[in-house]
Amino acid sequence: MNHSLMEEEGALLVISQFTLMASTKKGNRPSYIRAARHEIAIPLYEHFVTLAEEKLGKKVAKGVFGADMKVSLLNDGPITIIIDSKTRE
């Protein structure tokens, strides 16, 4: 946790995930009304990837924006943190 991606010469994979903006305040299903529309989100996503490539000085792997993707994750680190908010957001 004390080293940056650049110090470790690691790689970066950027995947869009609108579900991070889910609201569970009301009803039985999450609402995604706060997620940005495609015409706003896609340029932001591409801009972030470009900035990351410039900062790292190498290509950044990326997912297909808006696609249904299967992603496998292997955490290699000392901790995993789950934060449970009392506001249910």
Can you annotate each of these PLM segments?
Residues 25-28, 73, 81:
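Short, well-ordered secondary-structure micro-motifs
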Residues 1-9, 22-34, 38-51, 55:
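Compact, glycine-rich, soluble single-domain proteins
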Residues 11-14, 80:
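Structural motif
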